C-alpha cells in the first residue's frame, strides 16, 4: 500500500444528520461511493470503471459523525481479482476514524449485463498506484 491513501473530502449536509444529531448510518455507503467515484477515474484515467457493480459492502462504525465534523474518506485497493476489485476505506471525522469499510466491485459489461475480466491496463495502473 502507498504511504498515504487517496483521500476525498466529504461535505456533511444538514439532511445527512438524523434526530440523534449524527450522520445516519445509511449515508456512510454514499460517502464510500463518493470516494470510489473520484478514485477510479483518477487512477484508471477512464470513467468506464464506474460501470462496476457493488457485490459486497461491510462497514464497522467506530464513532458518530456530526454536522460539525470535517469528514474525509481514505480509499485504497487491497486486491484485484479476475473480475473484482476489493477496496478498503477509513471514514475520518475531524481526524478520528469514524468507520472502516470494505467493498468488492465487480467489473461489469453494460451491453451483456455480465461480469467481465479486469482489463490488464486497469490492473497495472492500480498495482502501480497502490504499490501492490
Q: Language-model features: where?
A:
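ABC ATPase A-loop
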Residues: 52, 66, 70
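Hydrophobic residues positioned within well-ordered beta-strands of beta-sheet architectures
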Residues: 6-10, 55-57, 73, 87, ...
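Hot-dog-fold acyl-thioester-processing enzymes
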Residues: 2-56, 110-132
Amino acid at each position: 500500500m502507498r504511504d498515504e491513501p487517496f483521500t476525498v473530502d466529504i461535505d456533511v449536509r444538514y439532511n445527512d444528520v438524523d434526530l440523534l444529531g449524527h450522520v445516519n448510518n445509511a449515508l456512510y455507503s454514499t460517502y464510500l461511493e463518493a470516494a470510489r467515484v473520484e478514485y477510479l477515474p483518477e487512477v484508471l484515467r477512464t470513467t468506464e470503471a464506474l460501470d462496476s457493480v457493488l457485490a459486497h459492502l461491510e462497514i464497522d462504525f467506530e464513532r458518530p459523525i456530526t454536522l460539525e465534523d470535517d469528514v474525509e474518506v481514505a480509499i485504497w485497493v487491497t486486491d484485484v481479482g479476475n473480475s473484482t476489485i476489493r477496496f478498503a476505506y477509513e471514514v475520518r471525522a475531524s481526524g478520528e476514524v469514524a468507520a472502516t469499510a470494505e467493498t468488492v466491485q465487480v467489473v461489469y459489461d453494460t451491453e451483456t449485463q455480465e461480469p467481465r475480466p479486469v482489463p490488464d491496463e486497469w490492473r497495472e495502473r492500480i498495482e502501480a498506484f497502490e504499490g501492490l
